[in-house]
């Protein structure tokens, strides 16, 4: 029986009027972005060094970034080829592999939900690491090691594997979305099935909690950075040796917290875009579970659900490009010249003027 709200659930061909162009562009953009991000990590973030120089150990932050990049790359490589193949053969996911019935659709939906949740959890781990490094440096230095950071990806993978497999054992349901090239868990049910709707609400609630936790961690890290800035101003107060020249404050600040500022800016932008891409899915899951949807609006509701899924899939494409931009030396130099140096010089100049006025009196 075809679900009333999912008209493409049992279709065997791709719905007319749809093109693979956008899917191909998104796949190639995500693939190139993740590969470039991995190249940057291998070149600098994970400890590349000149000949005859000791190789520095990778930082916990870069280990986590590496895990997130690998996760996004795997998700993109496991999902997009099936979408492009479905368009090329004009077959839906249910019929793309003859004799598989709905097995491929089930696997596709599992992979989509798995990597969507795994990327979110790893982004939370990065936000926690940044917060601890700024707010609790002693605890961070003593307990957070690169080896422990490398354990985040396997632990996250094990949890997501168990959680996202629940629809395969009857708690929740995977369905095929129009135009026949997407499969995901069902968010609207004509009979208000408790198991189907409970899983979608549980998934959305977990995503919402993760989003809130990431935002709180970043806000706390920003507060710690502001406190560091106030301490820096204290070093540049009148009578302090560091006030003699602007470069001294800058040299003092650069190794102390400018790298952490880079990390925080990277996390903040990734979090904003991640939140924008995740909230539509969270909203659609709650909307389908708690609001009675008229049967005649089934097509409209499915279109909105599909739009939310596409927003979710953009995360793995955007994240590596943000990382590439922020780790580019030209961008970092531009940012520090525009934002950091004027701030330090302003503090030095105001303190210097105050000292001159006091001496003239």
Curated annotation (Swiss-Prot):
Disulfide feature = 105-183
Q: Which stretches face the Cytoplasmic side?
A: 43-58, 129-150, 217-262, 332-361
- GO CC aspect terms: plasma membrane
Q: Which positions does UniProt annotate with glycan attachment?
A: 10, 90, 297
| Highest taxon, organism lineage | Eukaryota
Its record classes its membrane topology as: Multi-pass membrane protein
As for subcellular location, the record says: Cell membrane
Keyword Nucleotidyltransferase in annotation: no
Concerning SUPFAM superfamilies, the annotation shows:
Family A G protein-coupled receptor-like
- GO biological process terms, semicolon-separated: inflammatory response; mast cell degranulation; positive regulation of cytosolic calcium ion concentration
The record's comment on protein family reads: Belongs to the G-protein coupled receptor 1 family.
Protein name per the record: Prostaglandin D2 receptor
Gene encoding the protein: PTGDR
